[in-house]
A protein has these predicted regions:
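N-terminal non-catalytic structural scaffold regions of very large proteins
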Residues: 1-91, 102, 106-116, 123-124, ...
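Catalytic cores of nucleotide-enabled group-transfer and carboxylate-activating enzymes in metabolic
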Residues: 144-147
Length: 152
C-alpha cells in the first residue's frame, strides 16, 4: 500500500516501531520499515548491511517511512569507528570535537595496534540528527593523523 509511516524521535501512540540495532538510523537518514513477526516495525537505514537482503527476500513486509519535517527533542544512537595513527593527545582532540556539537558520548573504546602504529577507536554517540552527526564526522576528519572515520 502507499501508506507512509511518519517517524519522529518520540513514540507514536498505537504504532510500535523501534530503531534497528544493526544500523542505528538517526533523524534524516534514508530509511525503510520492516514489519517483524513479533517486534513491531524495525526501522533500518537504506545503507544497512541487512537492507538488500530484507528488501529482496521480504518485499511484502516493507513499510515505507519518512521522518517528520523537523527533528523532535529526542536523540538517536550512532556508532562511529575512527582509525588514527598513535599520537599523543589525538584521543583528547577527538573528544574535544565531539563535545563541540550537540552530541553525548555514550561509549568510547580504544584498541592500540602497535604492529601498524594505529588506534582503532569505536564510539557510540547520542545525536539529534544525521546533520549533527555529519558535522562531527567531517570535523574529526580534519584532525591531523586521522586515517579513516566511518559510521557503523
Amino acid at each position: 500500500s502507499d501508506d507512509i509511516l511518519v517517524l519522529n524521535a518520540k513514540d507514536l501512540k498505537g504504532l510500535d516501531y523501534k530503531m534497528s540495532k544493526c544500523c542505528n538510523p538517526v533523524f534524516g537518514d534514508d530509511v525503510f520499515g520492516f514489519v517483524t513477526r513479533t517486534d513491531g516495525i524495525k526501522i533500518h537505514r537504506m545503507s544497512c548491511p541487512n537492507a538488500a537482503r530484507l528488501l529482496e527476500m521480504y518485499p511484502y513486509r516493507i513499510q515505507r517511512v519518512r521522518w517528520a519535517d523537523t527533528p523532535t527533542s529526542g536523540t538517536f544512537q550512532a556508532s562511529l569507528r575512527v582509525i588514527t595513527s598513535i599520537e599523543p593527545f589525538i584521543i583528547n582532540q577527538i573528544m574535544d570535537v565531539v563535545n563541540t556539537f550537540r552530541t553525548t558520548m555514550r561509549q568510547f573504546n580504544v584498541n592500540e595496534n602497535q604492529r601498524n602504529g594505529t588506534y582503532d577507536i569505536s564510539m557510540k554517540l547520542s545525536v539529534p540528527s544525521n546533520m549533527e552527526l555529519d558535522k562531527v564526522i567531517s570535523q574529526i576528519k580534519t584532525l591531523k593523523n586521522i586515517v579513516k572515520v566511518v559510521r557503523q
